[in-house]
Amino acid sequence: MSAPARPAPAAPIRVAAGTTAGQAVRDAGLPSRGAPDAVVVVQDPDGRLRDLSWVPDADVDVIPVTADTEDGRSVIRHSAAHVLAQAVQALFPDAKLGIGPPITDGFYYDFEVAEPFTPEDLEALEKRMRQIVKDGQLFSRRVFESKDEAREELANEPYKLELIDDKSGDLESSDEIMEIGGDELTAYDNLNPRTRERVWGDLCRGPHIPTTRYIPAFKLTRSSAAYWRGDQNNASLQRIYGTAWESQEALDRHLELIEEAQKRDHRKLGVELDLFSFPDELGSGLPVFHPKGGVVRRELEEYSRRKHIEAGYEFVNTPHITKEHLYITSGHLEWYADGMFPAMHIDAEYNDDGTVRKPGQDYYLKPMNCPMHHLIYRSRGRSYRELPLRLFEFGSVYRYEKSGVVHGLTRVRGMTQDDAHIYCTREEMRDELARLLQFVLDLLADYGLDDFYLELSTKDPDKFVGSDDMWEEATETLREVAESSGLHLVPDPGGAAFYGPKISVQVRDALGRNWQMSTIQLDFNMPDRFELEYTAADGTRKRPVLIHRALFGSIERFFGVLTEHYAGAFPAWLAPVQVVGIPVADDHIRYLDGLVAQLRALGIRAEVDTSDDRMAKKIVNHTNQKVPFMLLAGDRDVEAEAVSFRFGDRTQVNGVPREQAVAAIVDWVTRRENATPTAELVEISAETGEG
């Protein structure tokens, strides 16, 4: 179990007053341009990243930030975005600039251009970028004296002007804040290294690398349309994506990962394996599961259901819609309205003249299951003897996601959450959280996901309900439980929902990608809002502590993650078809029918391929369909009451006695092995030979 790989923190160095951070780096003999661990910026005592040209007013200790760290890569990528924008305006002089932030594993920049970018355009832009990098242009920070000065300089950049005008108001995202900054309004100029003349510039907070030569490896990956500021009511711009790394080797590894990820894309595999689809007639973000996908989903849910019963959970069911008042009580309409579908106004009655005889009511599709679970808790008096009370539901919820962010099964509008709410006393709280975290980790591991780290999301000071004392107690309790697990804990300041802090279980998949999976959220607020109580041992009425928990996040998302983790080759216990019988000729179908019937009677999902394809073609087809066990039968097999095993890795074991074959398959499936079965792994041996 591990956290994301990261280099060890560098030792502090002293920057003398009146000298640059870069000079201190050189004096310390630290790596410079060209090395993967070259220092690209420094971190000051307040945690702010500073250019190497930064000159402090007083002596100060700083942390060197190298190119092979996440912060270092982010700076390189931000600078690469500037190089891209310069290249675009050189080749497309009429292009207007949007924003260009670093993102996970890369960067993008938005442009207003007359026509969408083509693959040939991206090739030309890459070539121009390489020349800019080779030129070694200097990044130079400049502070505007006033907004008016900035407006005058950027008079021909309408999107930059909009950001300048919004500087004193609410910027929409951290990407925009990166453009504008906090206390000062600044630009970064690219200077000719010989003449120091300004070549190009952009409104930007920074920081940046010293020169363009600090970008050792980059590549433009694709382009797409994107709404300005993510709002579909705004102009549609053209976005170019790219990636940049500390070395060519790191870039090559990343591109290989992208290629493999494309092969594993669950949207592609969903079609190839006939698992699910997204009919246009239903709308964006609303998947349907086909029979094979339905089998996988059923197995996912059934195993989870069984483990929850063993862990003392009680199953409930709640409706898909509710009256408005429920979400007023819960606070969702105040804090989460943007994520809810519009109200349905129903039950109104009208007179013949159209006047209202009886007012209707607003109903909402539920975005969360928790308020309905609270009503179940509140439906009768509760005693401390009933606690902890663990309510669980596979509950359908509906959330409005903008069409631009909907993505396959991992970001949908209609989903099924494996949602649990645990009500306990404060005295039980810590033990229940520790028990719950271990349950989550164990269950995820049962599905083959066992590389974890934890993230602690704390209060957003601008978006929370409840007292500061409640939040502090909840946060510290979660922190103690997370730390006691022995897993690496990463802080997420301001990342909590409005009603309480949470632990997120982050999982690394087979490609080393991180996914947020399970969430455990402590909530002292909802019991007050719903007036939840229990009778304590001394006869007094007390509020229970509430713990929210979604283990898979949603069934749909978990399905998508597992599909990519296993590249569609689900473990045999989850596979939609576990065994396929392949006859050498039609004369052998009847024998395999009997074998398949025997397997089905033992709970194995098995079938016989009776198509007109030749045997070799059938093997290829079922290998591509990721069927874990292929059983071949010819004359010798029928005569000897045997079969030949064929596996996805093309290994084969011939002449396995029928009863031994059945026992081996049943044993493998019932043990819920997550490895792909091979001749080496499955305990079978041949006693006869088909040849």
Swiss-Prot record:
Q: Which reaction does it catalyse?
A: tRNA(Thr) + L-threonine + ATP = L-threonyl-tRNA(Thr) + AMP + diphosphate + H(+)
Keywords, in A-Z order: Aminoacyl-tRNA synthetase, ATP-binding, Cytoplasm, Ligase, Metal-binding, Nucleotide-binding, Protein biosynthesis, RNA-binding, tRNA-binding, Zinc
Looking up SMART domains in the UniProt record yields:
tRNA_SAD
Q: Where in the cell is it found?
A: Cytoplasm
E.C. number(s) listed in UniProt: 6.1.1.3
A Pfam family per the record: tRNA_SAD
- This protein's name: Threonine--tRNA ligase
**Organism name:** Mycolicibacterium vanbaalenii (strain DSM 7251 / JCM 13017 / BCRC 16820 / KCTC 9966 / NRRL B-24157 / PYR-1)
